[in-house]
């Protein structure tokens, strides 16, 4: 008669891969059109001027400029891209 129960495999031991979410370009940083500014789940940050939103709520630059974060009415946070004034030649 066995005195020890058969050792079963652990029921834990699995984990999902990290999704690398968060702010990729911070306030004041320069961006070009297409640069990803924020990767997020849901709309923690909303798109402002010159910023587009992807189907997974990723915010990206629509034009060249500097990133700006601001909080507006309703306590919502918005991300905008302020176009750089090009020097007249």
UniProtKB/Swiss-Prot annotation:
InterPro entries: Ribosomal_bL27 (IPR001684), Ribosomal_bL27_CS (IPR018261)
PROSITE patterns registered for this protein in UniProt: RIBOSOMAL_L27 (PS00831)
Molecular function per GO: structural constituent of ribosome
GO BP term, pick one: translation
The keyword Ribosomal protein is annotated on this UniProt entry: yes
Disulfide bridge partners, by residue number: none
Gene3D superfamilies xref list: 2.40.50.100
UniProt keyword Ribosomal protein, yes or no: yes
GO cellular component terms attached to this protein's record: cytosolic large ribosomal subunit
Keyword field: Ribonucleoprotein, Ribosomal protein
Region (Disordered): 1-22
Family membership: Belongs to the bacterial ribosomal protein bL27 family.
PANTHER family: LARGE RIBOSOMAL SUBUNIT PROTEIN BL27M, RIBOSOMAL PROTEIN L27
Name of the protein in question: Large ribosomal subunit protein bL27
Organism: Bartonella tribocorum (strain CIP 105476 / IBS 506)
Lineage, highest ranks first: Bacteria, Pseudomonadati, Pseudomonadota, Alphaproteobacteria, Hyphomicrobiales
Gene responsible for this protein: rpmA
């Amino acid at each position: 008669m066995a005195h020890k129960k058969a050792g079963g495999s652990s029921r834990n031991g699995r984990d999902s891969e990290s999704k690398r979410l968060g702010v990729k370009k911070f306030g004041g940083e320069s961006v070009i059109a297409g640069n990803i500014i924020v990767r997020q789940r849901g709309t923690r940050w909303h798109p402002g001027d010159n910023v587009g939103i992807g189907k997974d709520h990723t915010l990206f630059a629509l034009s060249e400029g500097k990133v700006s974060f601001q909080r507006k009415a309703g306590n919502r946070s918005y991300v905008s891209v302020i176009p750089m004034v090009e020097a007249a030649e």
